Amino acid sequence: MLNYYMQKKCKICIKNHEIVVSLKNTATAELIWKSLPFSSDINLWGEEVYFYTNLSSELEDDAKDIISFGEIAYWPSGKAIAIGYGKTPISRSSEIRLADKCNI
C-alpha cells in the first residue's frame, strides 16, 4: 500500500517579506490551516516576531520553550504565533527562548 501525504504550506507576509512555512501534522497546525487566511498586527520581543490570533489550542505533549531557527511556534496561553530568529530578552547564551512552552 502506498500512502501519499501532501504537506500543507502557508505564507506569512510581514511588510515586504514573505515566509513560506510547512505545517507539521499536528492538531494545532490543522487548526491554523482551517483558520486561514487571517490578518494580525506584528509585535517584536527581542529577536522574535509574534502576532495574536483568535485561535484556541491546548498545549501539546511535545511543546517546548527553546526552539531552533526557522521553527514556527503557537503560544496557547497568549493565543499568538511566534517566529523566533534570535535571542529574546530571556535567552541564555545564543538560544532562542520563548516566553512559555509553545506548540511547534
Language model features: what each stretch is:
Residues 1-39:
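Long, hydrophobic N-terminal alpha-helical segment
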Residues 25-31, 35-104:
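Glycine-rich active-site loops that engage anionic ligands at enzyme catalytic sites
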